[in-house]
Amino acid sequence: MPIGVPKVPFRSPGEEDAIWVDVFNRLYRERLLFLGQEVDSEISNQLVGLMVYLSIEDDTRDLYLFINSPGGWVIPGISIYDTMQFVPPDVHTICMGLAASMGSFILVGGEITKRLAFPHARVMIHQPASSFYEAPTGEFILEAEELLKLRETLTRVYVQRTGNPLWVVSEDMERDVFMSAAEAQAHGIVDLVAVENTGDFA
């Protein structure tokens, strides 16, 4: 039986009595954000709104984005990435579980030196895919041109943020490339791999 989103007590500054809020609302107040689903317009708008609001509230405290996502739509993913670059606070990205496709693109978009993967996390990169398998030829050609532009944009970002040469990133994006946390670190997608049972990072 589903139990819904758990609620936890929260006491606002200056208030005597605590109120019950859902756990994600409580964590947002600590600047901890979550991408735990496929990337679509709804979650993109939520995360963009939260990042902008929290930046207005305090532009000196870092934000932390936890990622466990199979990927999703390219444009909503790019809007999350662009917002991360735009807001004044540094955005830490933390991969737990899987960061695939647009999930890995958002992961690599964290502040360089502040991108982390948990030890058993997996990362996957590949090129954007088309949704027009049975479209008329004209529409298919237009979409193919747009896909090439999007692929070029994504490739440039991976090159810039991983430090890998263009030919390496282009080759990797030809197919699904899965990586362990350590391989993602070697590839420049994350900077740190968490060490189990300690507060240190490797």
Swiss-Prot record:
Q: Which domain of life is it from?
A: Eukaryota
Q: Which residues form the active site?
A: 101, 126
What GO CC annotations are associated with the protein?
A: chloroplast stroma; endopeptidase Clp complex
Query: SUPFAM superfamilies from the entry?
Result: ClpP/crotonase (SSF52096)
- Choose any GO biological process term that the UniProt entry carries and state it: protein quality control for misfolded or incompletely synthesized proteins
Q: Which InterPro entries match?
A: ClpP, ClpP/crotonase-like_dom_sf, ClpP/TepA, ClpP_His_AS, ClpP_Ser_AS
**GO MF entry, a single one:** ATPase binding
Entry keywords, A to Z: Chloroplast, Hydrolase, Plastid, Protease, Serine protease
* Reactions that this protein is recorded to catalyse: Hydrolysis of proteins to small peptides in the presence of ATP and magnesium. alpha-casein is the usual test substrate. In the absence of ATP, only oligopeptides shorter than five residues are hydrolyzed (such as succinyl-Leu-Tyr-|-NHMec, and Leu-Tyr-Leu-|-Tyr-Trp, in which cleavage of the -Tyr-|-Leu- and -Tyr-|-Trp bonds also occurs)
First-level EC class = hydrolase
| EC number assigned by the record | 3.4.21.92
Q: Where in the cell is it found?
A: Plastid, Chloroplast stroma
Per its database record, what is this protein's job?
Cleaves peptides in various proteins in a process that requires ATP hydrolysis. Has a chymotrypsin-like activity. Plays a major role in the degradation of misfolded proteins.
Q: Which family does it belong to?
A: Belongs to the peptidase S14 family.
Which PANTHER family does the entry link to? ATP-DEPENDENT CLP PROTEASE PROTEOLYTIC SUBUNIT, CHLOROPLASTIC ATP-DEPENDENT CLP PROTEASE PROTEOLYTIC SUBUNIT 1
Subunit details:
Component of the chloroplastic Clp protease core complex.
HAMAP family under this entry? ClpP
> Mind telling me what this protein is named?
ATP-dependent Clp protease proteolytic subunit
